[in-house]
């Protein structure tokens, strides 16, 4: 504020206060740890996540999930009011109650955009289902009935029933402990 004239001091102080507040809010944001849970189709990714999420939450973590869908999915149920409004041409439709909301929009975005949303809401860990060809740190689910080896390049760990797997499918508690210990590096 040293370059402000006497007349501008009030405006400069307000601007300085806004900048200071914005900086404090930015510094308060912490990036969530990110871990992809990869594997071929029907390898058990969703089943593993269903087991891991409550175990990670029991360890005090706020956990979010980004699920990749290679197909264009329908986010709403035909016949509902929100579906009808979307069909009528609304570019965005939000449905909310006291405890949750769903915002449906159609535009191109990527996982970075979604991670920014999770970051703003203070998530500790974001698990990304799929993303086997991404550069994100990942664990891979490999089941002998489906595939014999990892489909992704250098997973941090293999979860499955194949020789050399780092974690067994039926020991999600051990895997949850390992993930919690790895979080600072993710």
Language model features with spans:
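Extreme N-terminal, non-catalytic leader segments
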Residues: 4-6, 11-35
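C-terminal accessory "lid"/substrate-recognition subdomains
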Residues: 19, 78, 92, 103, ...
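Walker A (P-loop) phosphate-binding motif
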Residues: 25-71
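Fold-independent oxyanion-binding glycine-rich loops
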Residues: 40, 68-69, 97-98, 129-131, ...
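N-terminal phosphate/diphosphate-binding loop that engages ATP/GTP or pyrophosphate donors
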Residues: 53-106
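Short, hinge-like loop/turn segments at secondary-structure boundaries
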Residues: 80-84, 111-112, 144-146
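Phosphate-binding/switch loop-helix module in NTP-utilizing enzymes
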Residues: 104-133
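Phosphate/Mg2+-binding loops and adjacent switch elements
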Residues: 125-185
């Amino acid at each position: 504020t040293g370059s402000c004239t006497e007349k501008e001091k009030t405006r400069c102080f307000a601007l300085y206060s806004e900048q200071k507040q914005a900086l404090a809010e930015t510094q308060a944001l912490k990036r969530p740890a990110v871990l992809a849970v990869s594997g071929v189709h029907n390898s058990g990714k969703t089943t593993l996540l269903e087991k891991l999420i409550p175990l990670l939450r029991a360890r005090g973590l706020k956990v979010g999930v980004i699920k990749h869908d290679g197909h264009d999915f329908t986010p709403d149920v035909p016949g509902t009011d929100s579906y009808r409004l979307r069909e009528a041409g609304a570019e965005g439709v939000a449905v909310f109650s006291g405890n949750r909301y769903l915002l449906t929009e159609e535009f191109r975005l990527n996982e970075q955009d979604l991670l920014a949303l999770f970051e703003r809401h203070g998530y500790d860990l974001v698990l990304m289902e799929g993303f086997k060809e991404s550069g994100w740190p990942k664990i891979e689910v490999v089941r002998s009935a489906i595939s014999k080896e990892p489909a992704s390049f250098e997973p941090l760990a293999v979860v499955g029933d194949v020789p050399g797997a780092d974690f067994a499918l039926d020991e999600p508690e051990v895997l949850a402990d390992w993930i919690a210990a790895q979080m600072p590096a993710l």
